[in-house]
């Protein structure tokens, strides 16, 4: 995970009041459907982005260009927050507190330490908390709306899983940065040519030594633009197919693109690469058990004592586990099979049952064990390692297809929402009016 400042400031979606100018009357910068973007929102995020860029070593463009990017970001956030309100989506305090606690834990900080670090950088905890709530709301709206537009067919999963099995680099991960030069819906040829010319110019500038992050902040329409276009780590096969195809033979430091898609022209930078090729092996157990259920006719102590007596008889050789299971076990599914449960992952069992089972040696019988089902006498018959690579590959293939399609569809959906919204820019603020 990126350092905590990048994470915190990367999530900022409203103004940090610590940066506003209280002596001035706040102004409306843009009307967005039934909401507004305030000038203080823009000013606050402008200062936050500059501070974050300084701490991350990123160069930023001039204020006019940066304000344009920030206003577009705030307009999209405003649209999505209004959608959340209409849809009745809320983030509970409990969910919010857990998300913040997770952020702190992932950055190896206590909540108290996070509060102190926020204060040191001029961010009040309450303001930050509400910023995270809004980010969670916009993510929830986007996820709900985009997810329903995605269809994954079984043959797609089979095909990708087979492809992954044939590719040595199927699990290659890349750390990427991204610039999107957008196109409007139904663009004219002139608009396409202008966007392509700009994309080609940016590629040439980057290859000539220009800072990718600065150009991303100044030009990209991607949601990560204000973070210098940094996408972070992701598996090759999780990327949009247009990207994955072009990155198959890419190497660290390479600039890839421009790549034309339905939403514009994309430029990628491969910041780093890492790979992992592994076989998925899991432990399965073959166990048998005898179950006694406490009832008005049998107390817990009586059930335990009866199982202890049964264990003593089995260990002395007077009877077998299978025989006594058929006689007294109250598990109808296994009693007639001599208590045999068959091969299975230990994780399917009740935690108390599982934990006791995993402590046994082959052939060993447990002491009476209490679970949510009653009292058990357990015997571990055998264990084995099973190759689950094929099943795991299909599961990964499904996740990769979903992530790939989500990334492609999310950008289209966001452009559609921006085009459909009523947006009026006031006082010459920099944005694309509708």
UniProtKB/Swiss-Prot annotation:
GO biological process annotation, one example: Gram-negative-bacterium-type cell outer membrane assembly
GO molecular function, one term: peptide binding
Highest taxon above the source species: Bacteria
Main location: periplasm
Catalytic activity entry: [protein]-peptidylproline (omega=180) = [protein]-peptidylproline (omega=0)
Keyword set includes Isomerase: yes
Keyword Transferase: no
Gene Ontology cellular component annotations, sorted alphabetically: outer membrane-bounded periplasmic space
Function: Chaperone involved in the correct folding and assembly of outer membrane proteins. Recognizes specific patterns of aromatic residues and the orientation of their side chains, which are found more frequently in integral outer membrane proteins. May act in both early periplasmic and late outer membrane-associated steps of protein maturation.
Domain notes: The PPIase activity resides only in the second parvulin domain. The N-terminal region and the C-terminal tail are necessary and sufficient for the chaperone activity of SurA. The PPIase activity is dispensable for SurA to function as a chaperone. The N-terminal region and the C-terminal tail are also required for porin recognition.
NCBIfam families in UniProt: PRK10770.1
UniProt-recorded name of the protein: Chaperone SurA
Organism: Yersinia pestis bv. Antiqua (strain Antiqua)
Organism phylogeny: Bacteria, Pseudomonadati, Pseudomonadota, Gammaproteobacteria, Enterobacterales
């Amino acid at each position: 995970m990126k350092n905590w400042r990048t994470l915190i400031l990367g999530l900022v979606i409203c103004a940090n009041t610590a940066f506003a100018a209280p002596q001035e009357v706040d102004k409306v910068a843009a009307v967005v459907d039934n909401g507004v973007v305030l000038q203080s929102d823009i000013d606050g995020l402008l200062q936050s982005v500059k501070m974050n860029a300084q701490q991350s070593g990123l160069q930023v463009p001039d204020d006019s260009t940066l304000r344009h990017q920030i206003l577009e970001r705030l307009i999209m956030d405003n649209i999505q927050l209004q959608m959340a309100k209409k849809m009745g989506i809320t983030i509970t305090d409990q969910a919010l507190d857990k998300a913040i606690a997770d952020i702190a834990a992932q950055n190896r900080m206590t909540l108290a330490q996070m509060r102190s670090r926020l204060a040191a950088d001029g961010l009040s905890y309450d303001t930050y908390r509400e910023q995270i709530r809004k980010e969670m709301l916009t993510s929830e709206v986007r996820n709900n709306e985009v997810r329903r537009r995605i269809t994954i067919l079984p043959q797609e999963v089979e095909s990708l899983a087979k492809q992954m099995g044939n590719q040595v680099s199927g699990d290659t991960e890349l750390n990427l940065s991204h610039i999107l030069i957008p196109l409007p819906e139904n663009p004219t040829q002139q608009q396409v040519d202008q966007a392509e010319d700009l994309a080609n110019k940016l590629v040439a500038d980057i290859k000539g030594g220009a800072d990718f992050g600065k150009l991303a902040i100044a030009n990209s329409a991607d949601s990560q633009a204000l973070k210098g276009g940094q996408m972070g780590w992701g598996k090759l096969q999780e990327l949009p197919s247009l990207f994955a195809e072009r990155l198959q033979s890419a190497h660290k430091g390479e600039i890839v693109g421009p790549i034309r898609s339905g939403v514009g022209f994309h430029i990628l930078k491969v910041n780093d690469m890492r790979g992992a090729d592994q076989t998925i092996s899991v432990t399965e157990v073959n166990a048998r058990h005898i179950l006694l259920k406490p009832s008005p006719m049998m107390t817990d102590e009586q059930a335990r004592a009866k199982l202890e007596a049964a264990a003593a008889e089995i260990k002395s050789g007077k009877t077998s586990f299978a025989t006594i299971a058929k006689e007294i076990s109250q598990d109808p599914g296994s009693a007639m099979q001599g208590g045999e449960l068959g091969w299975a992952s230990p994780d399917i069992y009740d935690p108390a049952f599982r934990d006791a089972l995993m402590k046994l040696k082959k052939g060993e019988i447990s002491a009476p064990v209490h679970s949510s089902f009653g009292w058990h006498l357990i015997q571990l018959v055998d264990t084995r390692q099973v190759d689950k690579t094929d099943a795991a590959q299909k599961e990964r293939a499904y996740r990769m297809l979903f992530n790939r399609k989500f990334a492609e569809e999310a950008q289209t959906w966001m452009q559609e929402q921006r085009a459909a919204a009523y947006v009026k820019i006031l006082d010459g603020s920099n944005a694309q009016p509708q």
